[in-house]
């Protein structure tokens, strides 16, 4: 009986996902876990002077305005 109760407690903690944090893609590659106040992922497209495209990605607390910017709020959504 104690084993069953312990199993239920552990499963409840796992399923509640306490302390959820957002995960975003970052530059130059890979992923990052955002800080608690960073609630969005962003992707910024920058054109260099040689007409090359540079993609900047990461976590942000607010979405910057303007063209060539995209923000989202789910895990790994800034691909």
Swiss-Prot record:
Residues 1-23 form the signal peptide. The keyword Chloroplast does not apply. InterPro entries: Snake_3FTx (IPR003571), Snake_toxin-like_sf (IPR045860), Toxin_cobra-type (IPR054131). Expressed by the venom gland. CDD domains: TFP_snake_toxin. Keywords: Disulfide bond, Secreted, Signal, Toxin. It is found in: Secreted. GO terms for cellular component: extracellular region. Pfam families: Toxin_cobra-type. GO terms for molecular function: toxin activity. Its main location: secreted. Disulfide bonds join 24-41, 34-59, 63-71, 72-77. The keyword rRNA-binding does not apply. Belongs to the three-finger toxin family. Short-chain subfamily. This is Short neurotoxin 3.
């Amino acid at each position: 009986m104690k084993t069953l109760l312990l199993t239920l407690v552990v499963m409840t903690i796992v399923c509640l996902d306490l302390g959820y944090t957002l995960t975003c893609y970052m530059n130059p590659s890979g992923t990052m876990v955002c800080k608690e106040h960073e609630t969005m992922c962003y992707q910024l497209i920058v054109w260099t002077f040689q007409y090359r495209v540079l993609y900047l990605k990461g976590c942000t607390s607010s979405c910057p305005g303007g063209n060539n910017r995209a923000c989202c709020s789910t895990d790994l959504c800034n691909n």
